[in-house]
Amino acid sequence: MSVGADRKKTGTSLTGKVVAAYGRHFEVEVAGGTIYSCVVRGKKKGVVCGDEVEILPATGDQGIIETTLPRTSLFYRSEIFREKLIAANATQLVFVLAVVPSCNLELLDRCLVAAESQGIRPLILLNKIDLIGQDEQRQAVAHHLMFYRELGYPVLEISAKISVQPLIPLLSGQTSLLAGQSGVGKSTLLNALVPRAQQATAEISDALDSGRHTTTHVRLFHFDADSSIIDSPGFQEFGLQQLDEASLARGFIEFRPFLGQCKFRDCRHIAEPGCKLLLAAQEGMLNSRRIACYHKLVKGLKKSHPWMETNKRV
């Protein structure tokens, strides 16, 4: 028997948006604001928060997801043996960093590459600026942020405990995905933006009997009539096994002027002679840390695809 087959079907199908995803259960909001508690028909997989779907109403507030409509974007991470879908149809990635814990720049770079691959606009948000202490720490943080500003990424510095007002105009008209490592204050930020968010999180935690009210699922909140915020669990790692080498390279936006300019058309920008990317790095035109991050990502692809070998040029 397929999942949900024991639910009595009623009426015709409705189109709605997945506003919460936890396990195999989903909340789908249809026109007028009615929310159905849904499961997926059969063995269909891949439904994610933010998806536009067609559901078949069942008894009461129950429903069955029958179809997932085409997406404009899909933000997810992928390891060698599994992938984790996070959100669909996001137009903006708000990557949250914090003074404490210290900035994980590799995690930021990986998420920027994922966003670039899907055409999602990135916004870098530094939270907890009230905790910046010594001059050395302040200078280090300022140096990191200036680098990304010079790349062309918007960067905002706030303390969610003091005021989120500077962030509000940047959320207007967007479906913004909040992402970042654990402990950077995403929950505090969300609760300041959407006062009901904490209550909604607690309700799902109670329903799942999880015993904890930290974010363990993905949920969409309406910020205003034209804007939404998708909250996601914190993470410490972000694999990009879904991307090939060309997509990885293009994900580092400062690499783009040099791509296609190398001596060899199939240059992988690892150690090939005549590589314009490596030459630019040697001349100080590209950041060595970002080059190293790209090389690490390519090396990770080789581990998941053993047949892939570095081209040797002479």
UniProtKB/Swiss-Prot annotation:
One Pfam family in the UniProt entry:
RsgA_GTPase
Keywords linked to the UniProt accession: Cytoplasm, GTP-binding, Hydrolase, Metal-binding, Nucleotide-binding, Ribosome biogenesis, RNA-binding, rRNA-binding, Zinc
- Give the PROSITE patterns listed for this entry: ENGC_GTPASE, G_CP
One Gene Ontology CC term in the entry = cytoplasm
Gene Ontology molecular-function annotations: GTP binding; GTPase activity; metal ion binding; rRNA binding
Cofactor(s) for this UniProt protein: Zn(2+)
User: Would the keyword Cytoplasm be found if you checked this record's keyword annotation?
Assistant: yes
Sites where the protein binds GTP: N127, K128, I129, D130, G180, Q181, S182, G183, V184, G185, K186, S187, T188
Cite the CP-type G domain residue spans from the record.
78-238
**Record note on quaternary structure:** Monomer. Associates with 30S ribosomal subunit, binds 16S rRNA.
Q: What does this protein do?
A: One of several proteins that assist in the late maturation steps of the functional core of the 30S ribosomal subunit. Helps release RbfA from mature subunits. May play a role in the assembly of ribosomal proteins into the subunit. Circularly permuted GTPase that catalyzes slow GTP hydrolysis, GTPase activity is stimulated by the 30S ribosomal subunit.
Family as reported in the entry's similarity comment: Belongs to the TRAFAC class YlqF/YawG GTPase family. RsgA subfamily.
Name under which the protein is recorded = Small ribosomal subunit biogenesis GTPase RsgA
What high-level taxonomic lineage is stated for the organism? Bacteria, Pseudomonadati, Pseudomonadota, Betaproteobacteria, Nitrosomonadales
